[in-house]
Structure formats: C-alpha cells, structure tokens
Amino acid sequence: VELTGTPSSNGLIDLWAQIYLLDGGERLGKTIGQYRERFFDPDKRNRTTIFSYAPKDGSLEYIQKAIGDICISMKSEDYLEMPERIYDEVPVVLDAPAAKAYKQLERELLLETDEGMITAGTAGVLTGKLLQLCNGAVYDSDRHALAIHQCKIEAFLEVLEQLNGQHALVFYNFQHDRDRLLAALEPLGLRVRVYQNTADEDAWNAGEIDVLMAHPASCAYGLNLQNGGHHIIWFGLVWSLEQYEQANKRLHRQGQKHPVVIHHLVVQGGMDEDVITALQRKGDTQEALMAALKARIKKAKEGAS
C-alpha cells in the first residue's frame, strides 16, 4: 500500500516512480526514460538542456486508464469537515527604478548596481534572480544581498495592517526576504518569530505570536498550526506545487475554526505572475487526475460492502 498527498506534485512526470513501486513498471514502463519518451515531448529547453516536459496529446487520459485499477483517490474535503479557503491576489506594482532594473536583467541577463555585479548564465538561474528581484533584493556572486526596492515590503505591511491584529503565517523564499521582513517588522512592536522548532509551533498555537515567518520547505509537513491563526501571506512564491499546497495545509486542516485566507503578493508583469500561472496549471493537472481516479473510491467501497 502506498499513500501520497500529492500524486503528481509537479505534473504527470512525477507519477512514474510512485506507480513503478506498485507494479514494477508494468503500466507506465520499466524506466523513467521510457515513460518520458512515450508520453511527453520536450517543453522548455535550450541547445543543450531540457528544463521541462509537456504531456503529449491523449497522455493524461491513457495514464488515468492505465493506473485506474490500482489507484483510488480520496480528498480530505470528501470525508472531513474542512474550512473554506479564500485566495487573495495582492498586486504589487514596481516603481520606475525597480521596473527598469527588472527589465534590464531580463533583457540582458546582467544587472549592475553600485555595490557589485550579478550574472544569470542559465534560464534556471535567471528565474531565481527575477524572483528575488520581484521580492526586492538579489544575491551577488559572493552571496551578498543587494537591496533593489521596497515595493513588495510596503505591500506586505499594508496587508498586515488590514488584518487588524489577526495573526499571520508568512512564507518567504530567500534568506534575504526573511532578513528584510524582520527589519521592516521590528519597529511595529509585534511578536515576531522565524519558525525553528516545536517551541515555535506551541507558541503560535497558544496565540503568543503575531507573525510567524517560515520557509515552506521547513514546515510543509507534519505541523499543526491551525489554532494560531487563519491568514497566510506568501511574500515569495515557490515553483513546487507540493511545497505550496502542503504549506497552505498547515492552517487549512481539520480543527481550523475560520475560513483560511491565502494572500499572494504578486509583482505585476514579473516572474511572480508566471509562478502563479504555473501553480494553477499544475493544480489543474492534479485536479483532473484526482477527479478521474475518484470513481475508484465508489468501486472500492462497493467491493468492500
């Protein structure tokens, strides 16, 4: 028996390993290479490297049918009383200097500041640089954070003010995000912590923390934070659908007494918008997969009765 909360966390490409453990490659192929060649075409790539794959026409339907006899799908919403989830997209408009710097880096893969030089030699590195720049600072080659703008910090503080004292779980992506957020929060007199261990979990649930900051990778699994608040603020988004969904489930889980509001700070025209789109696209893929397998629940229940 194999259990997973996100069967295709980053799209259908992730399914092969899980199904291979169940059937030894009978349904989707003996190797990941065979699986990719049969069901996917290269998507984003350069001359030497393939960064991602896109399903061929009909692949989703074939895969669903192929694994339907050994998989059943159950969502927590189907058997638990779950609170409502509300998504709030907060647009962040870069000021003129920040927008100019962003466009320059995107166009030339090179950004010069008075404090040093930052290079982005590959698409993957460029993506990271642009996400950093959306957030307001960028690491140089020596891992020094160069501050570029305060636009997203200001938007974050506005959202926090609108919460009117309600507690917030804040997810950041880069260490310089955390450091700049801490500096911005310091004058406000709020009880702020960066999540490190169960002592922080206990203090949050006891109502002793106004703002709990965390990287989604550090608390995406196993933490029960539903008693400490019902607002999530994504200061810096991540590409991983699994990390994103699991992080949101720290508050959106059984025992939460309020609707969970998930605020996304999204730089207009920036890489943030691409991340939101990618998360939504992967989510749609996963929802389609889960829906198609749902019929197995009914069949399994009928077989057990």
Regions found by a protein language model. Give the residues of each.
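Inter-lobe coupling linker of SF2 helicases/translocases
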Residues: E2, R27-A145, H149-Q166, I262, ...
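A short beta-strand element within the Helicase C-terminal
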Residues: A17, N224-L237, V261-H264
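A short helix-turn-beta junction within AAA+ P-loop NTPase domains corresponding to the substrate/partner-engaging
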Residues: W16-T31, H230
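Short beta-strand segments
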Residues: R36, P91-V92, L131, H167-F174, ...
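Conserved helicase ATPase motor motifs in RecA-like P-loop NTPase domains
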Residues: V1-L12
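A conserved SF2-helicase RecA2
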Residues: W239-S305
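Conserved helicase ATPase core of P-loop NTP-dependent helicases/translocases
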Residues: L169-F171, D179-C219
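PAPS/PAP-binding and catalytic site of the sulfotransferase fold
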Residues: G11-L22, Y62-A66, K103, L181-A184
